Design a protein with these regions (language model features):
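Divalent-metal-activated hydrolytic enzyme cores
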Residues: 1-35, 67-91, 102-216
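A glycine-rich, hydrophobic loop/mini-helix early in the fold
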Residues: 48-76
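Short beta-strand segments
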Residues: 40-42, 64, 94-98, 177-182
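N-terminal short beta-loop-beta anion/metal-coordinating cradle
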Residues: 18-59
Length: 216
């Protein structure tokens, strides 16, 4: 345990600093959480959800996986979405990828990666659908463009889930957004695919099938 003692020390220092800045900080956290936002992002350790959008603990409900995917057979992700919509009553769902994503890069490689290859298969489908455009780009630009297309694909997948469809049918206020985060400057690039109704899906498909300017 010697190699992680510094983490315990860091935790103690962090807790003390929080109380010093705000004596009621932890008292508020004990109550029921009521975030207005669900963040579905990549597991990459360089993409800290709360910090990126300047939100404190309790203000952002977070789910992360490799390459920020929403897959209809992933009960972990689907359970998070259902809980966020039905129990927490979130008003916005943010699908957030990041440029230079290792998962997206791995999906483009021909060498095997073991179990993760099954997880990345949907990204390869996105590549095949946009191969004509992507094959004209250099390696870095190709990865970054696929990161953008993957986010838009996940917005589409999320909008098709029963939980989202039912919320819209009930007239609930729920908007899905697609962003891509830049590691080199800390800014998010809005893919302009926000959708808040079944009818709004037409705009998402329109953006998905036209060439977008690269972020930044």
């Amino acid at each position: 345990m010697a190699d992680i003692k510094h983490l315990i020390a860091n935790n103690k220092e962090w807790a003390e600093q929080q109380v010093k800045k705000d004596p009621d900080f932890f008292k508020r956290l004990v109550g029921q959480q009521s975030p207005q936002y669900l963040w579905i992002g990549c597991s990459d350790s360089r993409v800290p959800a709360n910090e990126i959008v300047g939100m404190a603990p309790g203000e952002l409900f977070v789910h992360r996986n490799v390459a920020n995917q929403v897959i209809q057979t992933d009960f972990n992700c689907l359970s998070v979405i259902q809980f966020a919509i039905e129990a927490l009553k979130v008003r916005h769902i943010l699908v957030v990828g990041h440029y230079g994503c290792g998962g997206v890069k791995a999906a483009l490689e021909s060498k095997p990666h073991g179990l993760v290859d099954h997880w990345l298969y949907p990204i390869r489908d996105v590549y095949r659908e946009h191969a004509e455009e992507l094959e004209q780009l250099g390696e870095t630009e190709q990865i970054d463009r696929l990161c953008e297309l993957n986010v838009i694909e996940q917005v589409k997948n999320l909008a098709k889930t029963n939980m989202v469809q039912e919320a819209w049918d009930k007239g609930e206020s729920l908007t899905i957004h697609g962003w891509v985060y830049r590691l080199d400057n800390g800014l998010v690039n809005d893919m302009n695919v926000s959708v808040s109704s079944r009818e709004g899906m037409e705009q998402v498909y329109h953006v998905y099938h036209q060439k977008l300017p690269k972020g930044g």
